[in-house]
Amino acid sequence: MRNNIKSDIWSFHNKFRFDKKIILLLIRVSIKFNTKLVNYSRRPLFLDLLSVLTKKILFSLAVKSFKDTFITLKIRNCSSLFLKHNSLLVFNSIILKLLKNFYDVLGFSSYEEKKFLILFQNESLYKLCAFEFRDLTEIVFTFIIFGEIHDKDYSGKVCSNELNFRCLENFLIRVCDCVVYFSIKYNYNSSILYALRGHSWIKSFKDKQRLFIYLLLSSYFHSIIDTTQKLNNSIFRGWIVRGTYIDSISFEQFSLTSLKKLPKISLLVFLLINVIDTVIPQFNLFILFLRKAITFIFSDLIIKTNLL
């Protein structure tokens, strides 16, 4: 069992080893621009492409990592995900490893926060994580989205006995709506677990390993609801716009040279799409349909042309 888990962890690590910068770039750019451009109809097409492509890349990696399957999940507007049973344990141990590495940076200072962290700790599996996941850390924390859940909307009673997928779906929507401000680059005294602390629903989930899997595999891109909410400045440092506000991630590395691995024909198509979207804005319905169709087709094309 020990060797199998180590093997799975190492395999998962290798999945992210190649093209990590491209994946991280897509995640960063998608999150940044989706937060700034509230009006979806006026958002440039390439941002839609980045969002869809990022989601497909993440889920492609997830599916490749868990080939032997017997659990099928359906999460809001996404294809079925297949997870290997013992990989649930692996993911849980990886999350714990990452949280432990960033214990000081994330500002776990109070007794309650430490107590909450212990709730998700599986010591026997944690000890098996002998590898360093420094390359993974920024990627993982970029799309693990923790949010503030209001008990009146999503009470623990709904999910008390078993994992109710309908309740889980609503929960994920809310998580994507109210994103907790967290920081990796800067040493702000904030914790990604802060907003989860004390809510009754979290105590109702018996299988906390699966809960973290869902959180990990459900990125911000699954649901964006127009919500603007001012939260405690000392924790969240700003406004939540269209579901997320993350200014702690550095976007300085973004440049067109980062996309060198894309085939030239793909870049030409990419530019052509943006020209069409700009020149013919009056055909709103047609452009909307074309936007959706080309975005999905083009993202598949990029994946098939060995970007991953």
From Swiss-Prot:
Organism per entry: Cyanidium caldarium (Red alga)
The encoding gene: ycf55
InterPro entries: Uncharacterised_Ycf55_algae
Localization of this protein: Plastid, Chloroplast
Keywords, comma-separated and alphabetical: Chloroplast, Plastid
Similarity field: Belongs to the ycf55 family.
GO cellular component: chloroplast
UniProt protein name: Uncharacterized protein ycf55
